[in-house]
């Protein structure tokens, strides 16, 4: 099995964020001294990093599932959980990251380009780690002094990606099988490719570093091409993509072929046809030179063989008519290699200067279009990118069942952070959604109490029956020590500063109290003057009888008054 692998499908998952803690600080004489739950740690991310020492994607074939570490849970005493370590995966320089498309259980196909790691040190976050949940200490405020809940950590990103290696070399050696490409790269560099006297000996690209004085450049030995390679014949498109990154294409032509249908000119035109057909379907990055317009070099090989020199001298004028530089070499005797080496180095130097100028001009000419701000959107992190808070869509299954789907960064994140086993946390979620305007928007879309509402899509969607009058937090709990959500009445009693009165308030309360007493005394004097009260100096129950007279509740009494002038009841 070859050690060279240039395309793999990898399943990456970021670490989950740690859950927040819902702790209460307990001290002597203060059994409930306030919340002290810490925040959960952030999950680690899966990061791809271009490394010059990496030459293949072989490691990903045997280990296609990569997961970063998760963050730990927060603790009491406001101790935050530790963050999960990032998982940094080295990939060869020239690796392109694609979005994997396809049904579950079937081979994935490349989709949109996510990243192009063309330079050493380039990084790409393939799967971001989840954020840690907030503890109840971070959730406390003036109105929610003792939250009885904490937020859950968010799960890390999870998806499939396709890694595709496109070799980055200054010069690409192309030619028919057994043209001597591997022998040439072995003669010009320290590379040691497999060399044999049969076709398709080279099955994987070989890279070699060539030194020409103080100039250093790289050459790539692309496996042999044949007519129809652009349609999949021979090795097909398997290695044609390695030519995309090379700025110079060198045709290595065999001058001693024994095939009667082949000659140096026909070999050149046949390979150019395949390169042109492959380039038609190629989507090059902005500013890149199309493959048909890149510089060509003709290398006539094996001139040390009898009659090969005569054939090379015969076809040389034909190539020169096409304005193509021609070099006659022998990889066996090393004839002409020095001249070829310095000629390629000079051409590479010129192309590098053109590439630098082209990249600068592309950056200067790039047009940035800034969209107008729309109602219901907001800026993220002060940048021009706008983010719509949420979207609501009414959906149905065609059988009379319908529901409302709420999508948006904030609502979906809040749902993932909510512990639905905690009623107070559910009430907190309801308040956040109402404050964001979700409830008002649901009413505008025709939602009624009891309708099904789904927040998010896919496996992480949460469905529930909408109740716009849902009680909040602590009000849903059966506890005599709980006030409004997030409050504990025992903590309210310990706050003496809240009952402290100002001097003006004290004077006002004193005057109100004295006025109330004076009013009571005046009322008592009026009742006594009206005869509703008996003489308090006599110890009997006549004041009770007199009070009954005042209310008109006596129906019968004696005609003759008593010795003290009072009436006696029957």
From Swiss-Prot:
Listed Pfam families: DUF1967, GTP1_OBG, MMR_HSR1
Cofactor(s) the record lists: Mg(2+)
Which UniProt keywords are given for this protein, alphabetically ordered?
Answer: Cytoplasm, GTP-binding, Hydrolase, Magnesium, Metal-binding, Nucleotide-binding
- Cellular localization per UniProt: Cytoplasm
Q: Which residues form the Obg domain?
A: 2-168
Give the region (Disordered) as residue ranges.
15-43, 521-570
Any idea which positions bind Mg(2+)? 182, 202
Could you tell me which residue ranges the OCT domain spans?
A: 382-468
Q: Any one Gene Ontology biological process term?
A: ribosome biogenesis
Q: Where does GTP bind?
A: 175-182, 200-204, 221-224, 301-304, 330-332
Q: What is its EC number?
A: 3.6.5.-
Q: Which GO terms describe its molecular function?
A: GTP binding; GTPase activity; magnesium ion binding
- Which residues belong to any copy of the OBG-type G domain? 169-349
Does the keyword section mention ATP-binding? no
Q: GO CC terms for this protein?
A: cytoplasm
Subunit and interaction comment: Monomer.
What HAMAP family would the database entry show? Answer: GTPase_Obg
Family (UniProt)? Belongs to the TRAFAC class OBG-HflX-like GTPase superfamily. OBG GTPase family.
Q: Which PANTHER family match?
A: DEVELOPMENTALLY REGULATED GTP-BINDING PROTEIN-RELATED (PTHR11702), MITOCHONDRIAL RIBOSOME-ASSOCIATED GTPASE 2 (PTHR11702:SF31)
Its biological function?
Answer: An essential GTPase which binds GTP, GDP and possibly (p)ppGpp with moderate affinity, with high nucleotide exchange rates and a fairly low GTP hydrolysis rate. Plays a role in control of the cell cycle, stress response, ribosome biogenesis and in those bacteria that undergo differentiation, in morphogenesis control.
UniProt protein name: GTPase Obg
Q: Which organism is it from?
A: Bifidobacterium animalis subsp. lactis (strain AD011)
